[in-house]
Swiss-Prot record:
Gene: MARCHF3
Enzyme class: transferase
EC number(s) reported in the record: 2.3.2.27
Function: E3 ubiquitin-protein ligase which may be involved in endosomal trafficking. E3 ubiquitin ligases accept ubiquitin from an E2 ubiquitin-conjugating enzyme in the form of a thioester and then directly transfer the ubiquitin to targeted substrates.
Subcellular location: Cytoplasmic vesicle membrane; Early endosome membrane
Gene source species: Homo sapiens (Human)
Record carries keyword Zinc-finger: yes
Protein name: E3 ubiquitin-protein ligase MARCHF3
Primary localisation category: membrane
Length: 253
């Protein structure tokens, strides 16, 4: 630390015109207080006769909203839905809405807490087939399902009519002793139905695999918990029990 002939005022940086190096001072801004506590630490530097200020970090402050428990997923209180404490987490991470937890367990396809690894008692129910037909997943899977359904509805009657006409032609040729033409029409009918059945089988297996995967990862989760885990809305959270211990001022020169 160097000294020079400079005038010092409270909370004002030294006015040193002879020093070329910038002077840095870190103070806690007390202009905006919450319950007598500063809200953030501001770094003030002087360079070329100009003051430059930067917020270094914010300080944890207590507010009336922190005294009420809230859901750790949606950060909402218990006004719309009761809060639960179904796992071993404590403090602000220990309360959660039942619907939020069930939605998270369904989306993540897990049955335990990601923080304390407590395993929940859940009941999983598969979703109906109609819901998968409405929303099978990504956009390319929707296009594939829609295209295959249209092709199936269009090709099935076309293949049936074509096969029937070929067989009728083969029977007529047999009556007129045209065995070569009859054999050709029968072979064409067999090839037509073979290609149709092969395409139908491959498409059906592909969509069955997608449906089974969707059904496994998109189950309806029902949380099985006792009623004793409900958290009253007037119970203060553990965050309000811990006081914020900060120095009133930090100075670095």
């Amino acid at each position: 630390m160097t000294t020079s002939r400079c005038s010092h005022l409270p909370e004002v940086l030294p006015d040193c015109t002879s020093s070329a190096a910038p002077v840095v001072k870190t103070v806690e801004d007390c202009g905006s207080l919450v319950n007598g506590q500063p809200q953030y630490v501001m770094q003030v530097s002087a360079k070329d006769g100009q003051l430059l200020s930067t917020v270094v970090r914010t300080l944890a402050t207590q507010s009336p909203f922190n005294d009420r428990p809230m859901c750790r997923i949606c950060h909402e209180g218990s006004s719309q839905e009761d809060l639960l404490s179904p796992c071993e987490c404590t403090g602000t991470l220990g309360t959660i809405h039942r619907s939020c937890l069930e939605h998270w367990l369904s989306s993540s396809n897990t049955s335990y807490c990601e923080l304390c690894h407590f395993r929940f008692a859940v009941e999983r129910k598969p979703r109906p087939l109609v819901e998968w037909l409405r929303n099978p997943g990504p956009q390319h899977e929707k296009r594939t399902l829609f295209g295959d359904m249209v092709c199936f509805l269009f090709i099935t009657p076309l293949a049936t009519i074509s096969g029937w006409l070929c067989l009728r032609g083969a029977v007529d040729h047999l009556h007129f002793s045209s065995r070569l033409e009859a054999v050709g029409l029968i072979a064409l009918t067999v090839a037509l139905f073979t290609i149709y059945l092969f395409w139908t089988l491959v498409s059906f297996r592909y969509h069955c695999r997608l449906y089974n995967e969707w059904r496994r990862t998109n189950q309806r989760v029902i949380l099985l918990i006792p009623k004793s885990v409900n958290v009253p809305s007037n119970q203060p959270s553990l965050l309000g029990l811990h006081s914020v211990k900060r120095n009133s001022k930090e100075t670095v020169v």
